[in-house]
């Protein structure tokens, strides 16, 4: 008997969970470690989380007060469970209010556990953080992990068809489009530590792009230090093309949340509109029936990692 652990980023369901969400995220040393001395890390980033909460709350107000990522992940878990004919337990990494229920469900599970982080490309800061969480909180339950699927044929074909369907629904010809494939950024220091994220993103981009005209860019920088480039904002500012449409494809996100629904729409789309382009943002694949089928195929065919130490931030 196999139990599947479907792990996603998590997000506040209501405005009341914004502070706890930000504290869980910003005090995670896999995310913000290395910026300041370790003894100052938790108190400083807890303070920053509280200070940033009102600003972030205004962004979530644009989404109705909370993130849709919770419900999308829950729905995907239910549908994937039906597809796999197995138990699928959802996990929301930075929604601490849900952690006890997840840990209890895993504790009561029988047989082996396979972790499925919903991130196409592996990084210490996200998938590595999820793995570390369970090593710390559930050490008695060994979990094998599917750590990346960015070049898996099922993911590539699912995304390519999703893009075509979205454009066809708006009667937009692919030939009229320039494609900006946007993925979450990462500090360069992580790459120097051996993080494979940048290489995996590039390989995934090349597989997805095919014959399409476009380029990759990195969004969502925060904090100090040099991050992967080019940034999505820089590409939007410098872009020159004769194509009528700029199509933004957030291919590193399988679930819509604040970085697709607010950041792209409010920071990047206006730049392109001011330059006279028509702009289309491709929604995430979320819990679509095609993605459920593709994800099930990925789960059935992907290798599982059991040697976990190399997967963690050094």
Swiss-Prot record:
Gene3D superfamilies: 3.40.50.1400. PROSITE patterns: FERROCHELATASE. One of its GO terms (molecular function) is metal ion binding. It is found in: Cytoplasm. Fe cation binds at residues 184, 259. GO terms for cellular component: cytoplasm. The keyword Lyase applies. Catalyzes the ferrous insertion into protoporphyrin IX. This is Ferrochelatase. It comes from Chlamydia trachomatis serovar D (strain ATCC VR-885 / DSM 19411 / UW-3/Cx). The lineage of its organism: Bacteria, Pseudomonadati, Chlamydiota, Chlamydiia, Chlamydiales.
């Amino acid at each position: 008997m196999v139990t599947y652990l479907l792990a996603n980023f998590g997000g506040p369901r209501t405005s009341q969970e914004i502070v706890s969400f930000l504290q869980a995220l910003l005090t995670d040393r896999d995310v913000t470690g290395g910026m300041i001395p370790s003894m100052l890390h938790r108190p400083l980033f807890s303070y920053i989380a509280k200070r940033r909460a009102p600003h972030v709350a205004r962004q979530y107000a644009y989404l109705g007060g909370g993130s849709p990522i919770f419900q999308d992940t829950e729905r995907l878990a239910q549908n994937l469970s039906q597809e796999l004919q197995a138990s699928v337990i959802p996990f929301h990494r930075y929604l601490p209010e849900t952690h006890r229920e997840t840990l209890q469900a895993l504790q009561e599970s029988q047989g082996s556990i396979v972790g499925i982080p919903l991130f196409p490309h592996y990084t210490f800061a996200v998938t590595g953080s999820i793995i570390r969480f369970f090593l710390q909180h559930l050490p008695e339950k060994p979990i094998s992990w599917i750590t990346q699927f960015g070049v898996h044929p099922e993911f590539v074909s699912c995304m390519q068809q999703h893009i075509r369907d979205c454009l066809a629904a708006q009667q937009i010809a692919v030939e009229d489009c320039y494609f900006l494939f946007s993925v979450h950024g990462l500090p360069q220091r992580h790459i120097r530590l051996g993080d494979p994220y940048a290489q995996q993103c590039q390989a995934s981009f090349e597989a997805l792009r095919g014959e399409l005209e476009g380029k990759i860019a990195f969004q969502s920088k925060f904090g100090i230090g040099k991050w992967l480039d080019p940034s999505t904002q820089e590409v939007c500012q410098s872009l020159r093309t004769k194509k009528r449409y700029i199509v933004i494809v957030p291919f590193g996100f399988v679930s819509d949340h604040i970085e697709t629904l607010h950041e792209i729409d409010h920071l990047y789309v206006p730049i392109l509109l001011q330059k006279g382009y028509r702009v289309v943002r491709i929604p995430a694949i979320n819990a679509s029936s095609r993605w459920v089928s593709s994800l099930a195929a990925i789960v059935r065919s992907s290798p599982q990692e059991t040697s976990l130490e190399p997967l963690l931030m050094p």
